[in-house]
From Swiss-Prot:
MF GO annotations: NADH dehydrogenase (ubiquinone) activity
GO cellular component: mitochondrial inner membrane; respiratory chain complex I
Subcellular localization, as worded in the UniProt entry: Mitochondrion inner membrane
Summary of the function given for this chain in its UniProt record: Core subunit of the mitochondrial membrane respiratory chain NADH dehydrogenase (Complex I) which catalyzes electron transfer from NADH through the respiratory chain, using ubiquinone as an electron acceptor. Essential for the catalytic activity of complex I.
Protein name according to UniProt: NADH-ubiquinone oxidoreductase chain 3
Length: 115
């Protein structure tokens, strides 16, 4: 019963905060809030220029590989466990997945963002 009450309270509170955050900015619409800000000076150009989608994909790929490298960091400590064959198999699978992912990105020209 206490868990259900806590879940209901958290759900209602978070819903209320989301609704307030959604409706509050619509009350004060000023032109200054919609304009870009460059250190107090007038903008030199348009700040609403689109960026390259290829660059975005390279950045996402970098983040994914960085996260997978973080999975490899505990391997030296994991090698001291009793289940060494299981650890080596999992490490080999993870490294194989990284190599296959890199090869796929390379063949699909996903690492080239200049056009």
């Amino acid at each position: 019963m206490n868990v259900m009450l806590a879940l209901l309270t958290n759900t209602l509170l978070s819903t209320l905060l989301v609704l307030i955050a959604f409706w509050l900015p619509q009350l004060n619409i000023y032109a200054e809030k919609a304009s870009p800000y460059e250190c107090g000076f007038d903008p030199m150009g348009s700040a609403r220029l689109p960026f390259s989608m290829k660059f975005f994909l390279v950045a996402i790929t970098f983040l994914l590989f960085d996260l997978e490298i973080a999975l490899l960091l505990p391997l030296p400590w994991a090698s001291q466990t009793d289940k060494l064959p299981t650890m080596l198999t999992m490490a080999l699978l993870l490294i194989s997945l990284l190599a296959a992912s890199l090869a796929y990105e390379w063949t699909q020209k996903g690492l080239e963002w200049t056009e």
